[in-house]
Amino acid sequence: MWKLLFEFSDRLFAIIPVKKWRVFLREKVLFDYRNKLNALRHARPDLNFKKMKLAKGGGSIVFIIGKDTFKVRKHSHEKNKFARFEYEKRITDAIRPFCTIEIPNIKFFDAGGFTFYETPKIPGKMLVDIPTRKIKKYQKQISKQLAEFIYEKSFADPKEIKDLQMVQSKPGFSWNHGDMCSNILIDPKTMKITGIIDWEWAGYSNIENEFLGLVRVRKKMQKIGLDKSTHNEYLKLLKYN
């Protein structure tokens, strides 16, 4: 959907006779999509761009091509534009060894004046896009997997990211994703979680924030009660381990 919208808008803006207006709209509305796509084409001619998919969220736009995902900041002219990517990589590199659910393995490259974030595509469909009835049917299974993930992660205290902690280590605190609600990938056939993506706003905080993050921005998940069912499974793990 996003690819069609961006392509249509880009062609529509192309007929605007005043250049500065064309440039302004392409940068502000489409986030300089065409130049970023051309830069990626030039840097990675080996990719099949005919089957490219486009997504956007937070501060980035995402090109999904074959088995790879490429993220670039929407507003690449901003100061410290690379800082969020670098922060996310540090977090994921440090947390990954503690978790059995897949977390993106990030690398960077520059092309056409833009910094791209590249990671292998994790297979699956966004949990929020699965029908409510099906989520409810498999809610216990999903909640168990999420609880195990949060439990595993609660033991992560990597020295390499101590400088990113805003508070000292203490009981009940852990490294949290904070926004899992829209970033859980799941196999729609088995309904097993395949990955947790987009860690740029992760941080060290009270572990209760992780459960809130399962429903915070989605009324659908609030109605299902994914936070409560996951929290109950997590308490069982604490009791028996």
Regions found by a protein language model. Name each.
Residues 95-98, 125-164, 168:
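Conserved kinase catalytic-core helix
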Residues 60-66, 155-209:
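Active-site acidic catalytic loop and adjacent metal/ATP-binding pocket
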Residues 2-49:
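Juxta-kinase regulatory segment immediately upstream of eukaryotic protein kinase catalytic domains
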Residues 24, 76-84, 220-229:
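Short, flexible/disordered intra-domain loops and linkers
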Residues 30-37, 58-59, 69-117, 133-141:
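A conserved alpha-helical element in kinase catalytic cores
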Residues 114-126:
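Conserved short submotifs of the Hanks-type protein kinase catalytic core
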Residues 209-241:
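Active-site activation/catalytic loop segments of kinase-like enzymes and analogous catalytic loops
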Residues 44-65:
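ATP-binding glycine-rich phosphate-binding loop
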